[in-house]
């Protein structure tokens, strides 16, 4: 049997039509596979997500606006709880709503609601959320705040996403016209066909590009976010073709495992400094991930409490610390791959002065501006009230930069008169070694030492530590200080300065 041969059309019109079809097909294929336009650094709007009962103060919000150029704030308004078969609003925010920034009020649910989502009527849930939003909108008017919309932060199981769509559709008609409705999105939803129906019900969404996998056993080493997971999630979000803010993490996560390695609890609000300085916790492991995120593991020596967390002897507390570089890498990937439906980057969480678990606003700003995280360790020496013949000095160490030292790598050398050392009140997070500077610093007795080396376990950006130095004679007007450390990006940093001895308490 003779094989069939393909022949081009013979007429001129047919050839033109055929060529047009081929060109159109090639164009469509090219468009489908074309790489998205890369966003310029300064072209991506910035938003923050605030999740505390207390409304953020004006100073912290203004810092985010002025330094990070924040335009939008997603602010926790309250939770919806389920008790005795009824839904009710609990834990409403306290304080005045911030002005000078566009607000979206966020509502989530308690665990009892999540456990009953399959049986709770979507209309009833929508009505309770609408009632809470109405009350909060009136408060916003009195506070002079600019509320643009409502956001739902409800962790519906993937199989129940159709009920989430029903809830949002029931919510819409109860809101004022032009109210923007959005949701946060879990990484586990990305591959569900049901997600499309949810997204059709909202104006935009904020998918979380982190926390896609929780390490349920101590042996698992899973970062909060990784370049690989962010690449996957950003590509999925772009393909869904719905306007979105890219949700990026800027806070540490602490995970408590029992002695057998099973996960007990997870917290995102623990103070890393309290963990590293706890004498009951023994550092047993530290490692870095590819994007300068670091993981530290501590074993509890005995039963105890650290930053409100109860631990038993043998439990292991793991803390994953992001860095400015972690966020920088994530933001760079978003700008490169998000495409035209990107509305901006939403940083989880808003930096505030009393939240040591979150990156500082300076760290976030450097990251979003694609700047290197610069180290800056400042040392101050202040004279204190003299006790008998003992001269007392307060030593203050402050991390004023955007880079953290790797735990245990920060060393500060302070020159003192030979033989003057009497004592130092170093805490668990500060240790010291007496040195003799001649012929290169080398260990020597305290009575001969003319150089004190202080090793600081942990000093995060924005953190300040103070310790007390006792000498048997006064310091001169100035003294030499040397600082050396390894940053979380494993870069070496060193500096030497002549600093003045400041007047203190007489």
Language-model-detected regions and their locations in the chain:
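Substrate-binding surface in catalytic domains of secreted glycosidases
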Residues: 166-277
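Chitinase-like catalytic core of GlcNAc-active glycosidases
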Residues: 39-53, 78-201, 207
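Substrate-binding cleft of secreted/luminal carbohydrate-active enzymes
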Residues: 247-253, 259-372
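Low-complexity, intrinsically disordered segments enriched in Ser/Thr together with acidic residues
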Residues: 448-491
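Asparagine-centered strand-capping/turn motif at beta-strand->loop junctions
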Residues: 389-406, 414
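Catalytic domains of carbohydrate-active enzymes, especially glycoside hydrolases
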Residues: 56-83, 136-147, 337-341
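Conserved, mostly hydrophobic/aromatic
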Residues: 73, 152, 205, 246, ...
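A surface/secretory-pathway sequence property marking extracellular, secreted
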Residues: 418-453
